[in-house]
Every structure is written in C-alpha cells, then in structure tokens.
C-alpha cells in the first residue's frame, strides 16, 4: 500500500512512507500475561540482534527523518526499526 500510494501521490508532491517497528515496550504491547512473565519477555527480546525490547521514543528519529527535510526525496519506503529482528530471521 505504501508503494502504491507513493506512486499515486508523488506527482502531487506528496511523499508516502511507513515505519515497521519491532517489539516495542509500550503499555499496549506489554499485556498482563507478558508483563508477569519475564521468561516470555526474554524470549521475545532474544529474537532481536540487540537482545532487548525497543522503547517507543526510539521511533522518534525515524518519524523526524521521514517527515522532515532530510527525507524529502524518500517515498515508497518502509523503514524497519526492529532492533535487528529481521536480520535474524
């Protein structure tokens, strides 16, 4: 969808990008069962190259880049911010 919208809206000067976050430690992601189970939390963390959960603020740079002047020539891109989870697959 990101790529299709980038093609459709590009001629109008609109950039369309996406951010694909990995495991982020947020209240919504840390449900009661996961919050109560440190072993399960560690299993999820071990799936990333950095061996930890991400913090929501670690997405800030990606948002600022894609929304700002530095990312003005970037469109149709999905920026993966996952602590290296996809490189371990």
What are these regions (language model features)?
Residues 4, 60-61:
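Alpha-helical macromolecular-interaction surfaces
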Residues 10, 15, 74-76:
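Short, small/polar-rich loop/turn modules that mediate ligand/substrate recognition or access, typified
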Residues 48-59, 70:
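A conserved structural motif in NAD(P)-dependent oxidoreductases
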Residues 11, 23-48:
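A glycine/serine/threonine-rich, flexible loop-to-helix segment
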